[in-house]
Design a protein with these regions (language model features):
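Non-catalytic alpha-helical scaffolds and adjoining flexible linkers that form interface surfaces
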Residues: 1-18, 23-235
Length: 235
């Protein structure tokens, strides 16, 4: 049975093979051995690329399984310029944050939608924020954007709220770190899944970084590093 999948990462293995990290719709993220895939006559040569929706099957009983069959029903999504780094960022989130061999079908679908939006020229910040928010939900991190964490009072649009990761949002006028302050109107928009203005997108980005940081720990995302290097080289 063939399963929809994306390649998240790959690296050489032995003389002509690859270790391929895949994200599948029904079985989650795991590593496959693609035997002989780097050989000069391999039908897999050039096929196991990121940002391409594949269908594949595997065999084996251990954690490290062998790629059995792969088909490419669709063309690769073209991510050029900065959008390539946004795609790599999505891949790193999947690779680092999703537990291996655990199905996350809703994350898979959101990942596919985000890639298509990037390839179609949509404003990058929008699909990235949508994906991050859904990913946080899938990881079990649920924050209430409608009620204050300290007294369960309804969030007021005109008030400022400080973000405390273990609690949620608490009304306050100032905080030691201004990055943790959010306007109530923005929180209510998040509750509705709205990121339709530049200020909302900026606030959503701040929240995502704060909420995802404990999951990422001290890892330095390569996509972010490469993105900054590209921007620096372009002046």
């Amino acid at each position: 049975m063939l399963n929809p999948a994306f390649v998240i990462h790959s690296r050489p293995y032995r003389e002509t093979s690859q270790l391929v990290e895949v994200f599948t719709q029904d079985s989650g993220r795991f590593t496959l051995v693609a035997r002989g895939s780097r050989g000069p006559r391999s039908p897999l040569k050039g096929l196991l690329q990121p940002f391409t929706l594949l269908t594949l099957s595997w065999r084996g009983k251990g954690d490290l399984k062998n790629l059995a069959q792969v088909e490419c029903p669709d063309h690769s999504l073209r991510l050029g310029g900065d959008r390539l780094f946004y795609g790599l960022y999505l891949n790193e989130l999947v690779y680092y944050l999703l537990e291996a061999h655990t199905p996350f079908p809703e994350v898979f679908d959101a990942y596919a939608r985000a890639l298509m939006a990037l390839a179609d020229g949509e404003t990058p910040e929008l699909p990235l924020r949508r994906f991050e928010f859904l990913l946080l939900q899938a990881l079990g991190y649920a924050v209430d954007f409608e009620y204050a964490a300290d007294d369960d009072s309804p969030i007021q649009p005109e008030l400022l709220y400080g973000f405390e990761r273990e609690l949620g949002f608490v009304a306050c006028e100032r905080a030691p770190d201004p990055r943790t302050l959010f306007l109530g109107a923005h929180l209510l928009a998040f509750a509705e899944g709205r990121f339709d203005t530049p200020p909302l997108l900026q606030a959503a980005k701040r929240f995502s970084r704060l909420a995802l940081q404990p999951y990422l720990g001290k890892r330095q995302l390569k996509s972010r590093e490469l993105f900054l290097k590209r921007r620096s080289s372009l002046g």
